[in-house]
Amino acid sequence: RAILNWQKFVFYAHNQVEKEANDALVLSIDLSKQRMAKLKNDPIAERDQTSNTAYNRAWMHALFGRYGEARKNLEDVKNINEKINSPTAMHGYNNLMGMVSLMEGKAESALQFFEKGNPDNTYFLYFKALALKAVGDKDGAKEILTDIANTNFSYWELAIVRNRAKKLLENT
């Protein structure tokens, strides 16, 4: 049920239905905490749960234009994930920080974060394309948007950004 409510959060947040998005996120977090209670003393699971909670809260704040709040939650994500010995540990932080920076009008800064993020995350590649377009790299943006628009697989990230990418390509 935690995953189902997380999916509801994603749906409502991307449709700018704030109360329902928040309710779904809170329920998803609560259900995840209940699941964590059953794991008892698993420090890695607890760390991941804390990081994921901060990440999802940051994402929600970003989607509703509360960038300062998003940055506060992302600082928590950074403090947790930078201690993980993995080359991918900071991907989520960097991708979402890139999105926040872009939405604040800081496209150059956004690109620096996107370069350190997951290069295969379609959702954030869309925002990277927006940042490239904002700094005048229309060819770079077009390449990413074309890849997104021509992808024929089905997954939630693509469902959110594919039609948006197609519209941007039509206006280029």
Where do the language-model regions lie?
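"A position-specific structural signal for the A-helix of alpha-solenoid helical repeats
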Residues: I3-Q7, Q49-N52, N56, M60, ...
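TPR/TPR-like (Sel1-like) alpha-helical repeat modules
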Residues: V26-D30, E75, N118-D120, K138-W156
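Boundary/linker segments of alpha-helical solenoid repeat arrays
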Residues: R1, S32-D42, N81-A89, N121-F127, ...
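Generic long, charged, amphipathic alpha-helical segments
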Residues: V100, G105-N118
